[in-house]
Amino acid sequence: MNLTKKLAFRLLILSLTTTLFVGCNKTRDYKDSSRATGWSLNSKEGGPQKNSKYKEQETGPGLVFVEGGTFTMGRVQDDPMHDWNNSPNQQHVQSFYMDETEVTNYMYLQYLQWIKEVFPPENENYRKIYEGALPDTLVWRNRLGYNEVMTNNYLRHPAYAEYPVVGVSWIQAVEFSNWRTDRVNELILEKEGITARNARYGLKDGETFSTSTYLNAPTQTYGGNDSLTRGGNRSKSIEKRSKDSTNLYIQRKDGLLMPAYRLPTEAEWEYAAIGLVSVRNFNNYRGRKKYPWDGQYTRSGKRKTQGDQLANFKQGDGDYGGIAGWSDDGADITAEIKSYQPNDFGLYDMSGNVAEWVADVYRPIVDDGFNDFNYYRGNVYTKNAIDENGKVKIVTADSIVYDTLSTGKVIARNLPGEILQVPVDENETYLRTQFSTSDNRDYRDGDKASTRFYQSFGEQEDEVVIDPNKRMYNSPNHKVGTLDESEGGGVDREFDKSSSRTSMINNEVRVYKGGSWKDRDYWLDPAQRRYFPQDMATDYIGFRCAMSRVGSKTTQPKRARH
């Protein structure tokens, strides 16, 4: 009997302890009410609204998830070229997405077709838009080589449809990325029943969809055509319930629209290319990697493919692919995408085939002393232009701004339907500690304060006058402009013939990474870096897009960490 009483008493104590423990640690989940005010969420009467169904960012078309982390950026081996432009430094990149492959000819042709249909070059207002987007097919020509077959066929012939596009400048790659963002988000809205079915087809001249315009001034999307902007079944259903509803248009808080496609930063590209996940042991890297694949050699060591090259690159003098019947890499110029095995992130051709543009402005030094998180040089901060009525300014056919590049090529700065962008000014920079100007491309490396000729004596940096011939980087200053119609029109070019120029570095040269079909294996190392003018193109530089990840760092379920 006593034993039974003791057991019952112990069970009672245990249950009370459990109840107290659970009661003290119980917290509200606030799924249906505001953590700030206690108000009900998503009430029909009004109040705060929340997309409670949102889970994680979806992977956009063509992209692969790359979980971010810390890594040693820069060369981790000898520097036989003595460039001294990529000393090792520790960097951290956030998780992001990157194209599985390089952008192909067929992908770029879709862009050209869209421009030609929406902004027909027969219209004088739009003629230069299409011309400015065309790749430079003459990059294949060589004074002592016969390459006319590539000049005439490489971009458009179906035999090369799945080959990486070349002849594209950095500026054109950025414009393609912007176009891709809008087309992906346009399709999302149609699938969600917001915009009219097939609204993206058969548009009139200049009636375009812009993600930025839709988020900031949705009534101006598709040229203000409400039958397209609110023509979906879901929009019609919302409008029937309440014509004054504020939910007629998708907003950023709904989480439906994708972040922008863009060029990857140099840090992102290098991190994704090297793919250190294969040498990770718990929370440490077991060693270093020379290439995107494991090992110190460019040839496969596997039994089935032993001796085959793992990338498309130049084998030696006069050898771009081996001998007939036994090609080492299966290509002499570029190769079709996915011809070689992907790296450990699932990315193809991160070494070889074509080198790739990245977002950064080139400088010999990565300034890790100032920043070691999401490093990027090239920030130019802008804002939406506002008219006298307090509304954003939308670019029209009559207000397109064209830029004449140093090559004489004319490109549109903004397309009709987009919001006009202007540099940030003192309204955004006054007493701000993070930045003080719109253009930060040469910050701490090329600006006035970083040159040895800078002497402030108490003046503000923008008040100090320095001789233009005493710039930190004494690069050529070619001048180009357009002639008036009275002078016959065309382009006025003035080549800088000065013999005192000592550098090619300026704010208009961009980094490109990776080796190509035209390079020796030295350049297959993802740490190697080179630069090229942003408005020029070659037959060995292509590109791929990236996209930032919003939300959690990983797509994997949470697990215990030790």
Description of each model-found segment:
Residues 528-531, 536, 541, 547-548:
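Catalytic loop of the DD-peptidase/beta-lactamase superfamily, centered on the K-T-G motif
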Residues 2-11:
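Bacterial N-terminal signal peptides that target proteins for export
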Residues 21-23:
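C-terminal motif of bacterial Sec signal peptides marking the signal peptidase cleavage site
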Residues 28-44, 65-66, 72, 77, ...:
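Functional-site microenvironments in short loops/helix caps that host divalent-cation chemistry
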